[in-house]
Amino acid sequence: MSKSPITCHVLDSTLGKPAANVRVQLEALSPLNSQFHILATGETNSDGRCPDLLVGQSPKDVLVAKGVFKMTFFTGEYFAKAGRATFYPQVEILFQLTETPDAHYHIPLLLSPFSYTTYRGS
């Protein structure tokens, strides 16, 4: 079983703790028709991480060496379960891979009901 080449981590910055059970969807942009297609779906664990989006699949089988990808976090569902309102029902993060397909990419998301921040993690 190989390590997932793309991982994420969601932190609820208003509570100061990991955001568990956030549904996540990873998509790739097709260069042929400029449409996104789903590569994987998952859910953050109790530590707010989704380390196994593409586990068991070789990065070369799943990802191209270069390309545009989209990770969608279904934040409205997360906040609704907690009885909290949010301005952002989904957070979509588009990112571009420019390195070899065996590199690791980590997408952290710092989340609150009315703002979010992301960056290229390690």
Residue positions per predicted region:
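Beta-strand-dominated extracellular/periplasmic modules and repeats
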Residues: 2-96, 106
